[in-house]
Amino acid sequence: MKYDVAVIGAGPAGSASALKLSSLGYKTLIIDPCDTKKVCAGILTAQYVRKYGINHDFVERKLKGSRISFRDVHAEITYREAVEYSINRESYDRFNLNEAIIAGSLLCKDKVLSVEENRSAILIRTNNETITADYAILASGISDLSKLFGGTKKYAFCVQQKKFIEPDDYYEIDLQPGAYSWVAPKKDHVLTGTSSLVGYPDIPGEKSLIPLGPVKKTFSKRFLLVGDAAGFVSPFEGEGLYYSRRSGEIAAETLSDVMAGKNKLSDYQVRWKKEFDFSALSMISYLISNNMILEAFVRSTRDSEEFNNFVENILTGENKKFKIQEIGLLIKMLSKIIN
């Protein structure tokens, strides 16, 4: 059987793509061995909740806010109106995949060995068969396959552990120049994670890679890159669930138009760039990339209500398209403290 679209990967980006395409009547196949665990804090930001709502089947805790720290300087951000949730990532992925299957997507539980892109189709070889599709969406995260097709090659090395200690209702982020650690509260335990730019931290736990920014080109003749494969995460704290799901939808919408003869695949890049503004967040990450400025950043968050509100907007996704004036506020306030 030839499919309209093959979706490689059944995470939030892949399932969102498949759900949208199947709902529009396209013959869609999801390919994923469904045997891997994802290193993920599992936080649904206020931006995500505003866009998609919440299903409490996979929610483990409603969050009151976040704490950020650098060395012995700590700041607490209690959200004014934003609502965020800590989720069970495996349950979340199963829920999204099931929604796509209910909508009509087929699931191939197999590992992709190779992909060939030619003028007329995509040929995908798995352990057990060769699959043909008109187009493909690559939603397999950071992998050898995604790198082969232009996926992100800039990433951090992360290790995550489950610890059975009493959780509270705050997500904790320990900032370091070029890296960060986190404590994500769950129902009866916490997930602690540590990242590094130079290799996996020497601690036990589940290992994974987290992208450090979007790739230059997210499309080819018959391929679209989505989610982590495209590098879609916040440069500030690595949040990626909103970007994964939304990029999957944008990819599906673009392919629907392409198959209807209305657009080209390159339109995908135009569309996601209109919605995702990583430049301001990258600038913020760059500004706090040394110890002195980072300490001033956390201290300002602790001591200034105005600055605390600014950081809340970053963490909750309340305003992902920061204005130049807001970046100027950051520079001005940090300069006062440093001087």
What do the PLM-derived regions correspond to, one by one?
Residues 10, 22-40:
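Glycine-rich FAD pyrophosphate-binding loop
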Residues 256-339:
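C-terminal helical "tail/cap" subdomain of flavin- and related membrane-associated enzymes
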Residues 114, 130, 195-262, 266-270, ...:
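FAD/FMN-dependent oxidoreductases across multiple families
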Residues 14:
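N-terminal Rossmann-fold NAD(P) dinucleotide-binding loop
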Residues 79-99, 197-198:
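Short beta-strand to alpha-helix junction loop
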Residues 33-70:
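N-terminal FAD cofactor-binding segment of flavoenzymes
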Residues 10, 99-207, 211-219, 231:
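Predominantly flavin-linked oxidoreductase catalytic cores and closely associated redox partners
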Residues 1-11:
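Beta1/beta-strand and adjacent pyrophosphate-binding region of the FAD-binding site
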